[in-house]
Amino acid sequence: MLNAVSDSLLSIFYPQNCHICKNSVENRANGVACEACWKNTHIFSDKDVICGKCCAFLPESGHTTEAFCRQCDEHVYDSVRAVGVYELALAASIVHLKTTPFAVEKLRFLLNKAFLASPFLNTDLIVPVPLSSRRLLERGFNQAGLIAGSLSKNTGIALDEYSLVRTIHTPMHRAAMDKKAREMTVKNAFEVKRPKLMAGRNILLIDDILTSGSTASHCAKALKKSGASKVNVLTLARAA
């Protein structure tokens, strides 16, 4: 009741328009998008049959266990889950996250929900995909670290933001880059500074967007080289 009154007052004195349709955002918990745009955004559910390594949609086949498309077997990580498709409200929220670190309530909620529905509940350690020191200085924060920290707080699973590091400053991935180009930008870009902390652990790697899987795969390679038993990936969105 109080939240509804608060939202009504805020919408009067500090109106906020949806970043997609420009209509008013009535519920501030929805962040930068209105309720209608969130409903039009594809958030994955147990009704979706998706590949366990790239989150691509698979034909209906009566699967009751994890299914794979077999087009992405080269990925080093073991399995991946995403909140939804990189579109509409989810895409707008992730873009906003990169510049406004405090506006992540909706994304935190969705990530936590996706984790609880995932097969990753036996995770020992949560690790965010790191930024290079130069990119971190430019941005001021690591968006993957923000959502990883929130998940750690909600689940009680330990967080390690410092062991996995990006040693090479790589160019930002662009939509037009193909899989091979993305692969080259992150090759040998990651290493683990404290390998003893990874030995024998089930790691959950957190990132904001999964596109080709190259970044997550090279992070997993470094983590497994340091002795990690398993590396699974949880991301906010699967991009086309």
Question: Which residues does each PLM region occupy?
Answer:
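Glycine-rich phosphate/pyrophosphate-handling loop used in enzymes and phosphotransfer proteins
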Residues: M1-D207, T211-A240
